[in-house]
Amino acid sequence: CYARLKEYDTYNDEPLVLFDEKESNFNFTLVTATNRVVNTGDLYFTPVKGNDPNSVIMRLNTGEGSHLDFTYTLKPDDYMVQYQILGTGLNGVLAPSTNALDLLWEQDIRQQEKGRKFEDRYVTLNYKFMADDVEHLSESKSDSKQIPNRLKWIGYKDMFFSTVLISQEGFEATTLDSKAIPEGDVLKQFKTTT
């Protein structure tokens, strides 16, 4: 996983990278039909050629005629990556009670601007309820919140840029964590579980 904004640089003229594979984790937990718990981050997905030149399909083959596809689509001149999960022939592979996937999303928010203290005041974990206003965890200290209500989106924001996960159906039973890091290149560590 790697997200770089090509039109922008950090205060010291380095490429502006929102996150890379060392600073982020995006993982789903699956329960198999034999009650094994597996994490998608531990599995091997292979790229599959699709019809859309703006899309990448990563496929987890689970047996003859069955697979799990993660499709990433980035339209030209857009920053919004469309992400779709599609399972084919997974009856007998996943537990019959599977009706949703448990998500773990972690990201370190690195310092991008020259003034660490000033920038740190703007680094927040924001979230929006399906039919309500935007809320956020504390900007100044470590914070955690369990939210039973459905969320429309969750955003990890630094001073000027955000990484946002949006759901059409909403996220349920979400736990949000923000850990303040007092020194070094990382300002905060954000974590979301659903």
PLM regions: where:
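Soluble non-transmembrane domains of integral membrane proteins
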Residues: 1-194
